[in-house]
């Protein structure tokens, strides 16, 4: 992700794994962990987007506001709402336990 504006940027980042099965993806990553890096520094991570109630409400609203992939309550998909300064960032998805493999989709949106 490149944030090129001079102001901070509000972003929604998603790592979709188990929800892909509804679209016929057979080898979907069952429990993704999403990490956002600035260089080699991990600045945020999430596993299971709907664990914290306040974050669940904000994330659900951000997905509606941006037209992002809808997440089912209780799913093991991962999501982060971030405020990023200008710069370059990397989104990385891995299995939550470090050994799980499969197909995942990463989406990143600007939140209005």
Enumerate the predicted regions with their spans.
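A sequence-level detector for low-complexity, Ser/Thr- and acidic-rich stretches
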Residues: 1-112
């Amino acid at each position: 992700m490149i944030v090129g504006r001079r102001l901070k940027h509000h972003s929604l980042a998603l790592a979709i794994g188990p929800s892909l099965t509804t679209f016929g993806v057979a080898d979907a990553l069952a429990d993704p962990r999403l990490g956002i890096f600035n260089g080699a520094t991990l600045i945020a991570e999430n596993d299971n987007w709907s664990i914290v109630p306040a974050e669940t409400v904000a994330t659900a609203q951000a997905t509606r506001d941006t037209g992002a992939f809808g997440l089912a309550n209780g799913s093991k998909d991962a999501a982060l709402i971030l405020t990023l300064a200008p710069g370059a960032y990397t989104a990385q998805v891995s299995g939550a336990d470090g050994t799980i493999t499969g197909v995942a989709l990463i989406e990143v949106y600007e939140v209005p």
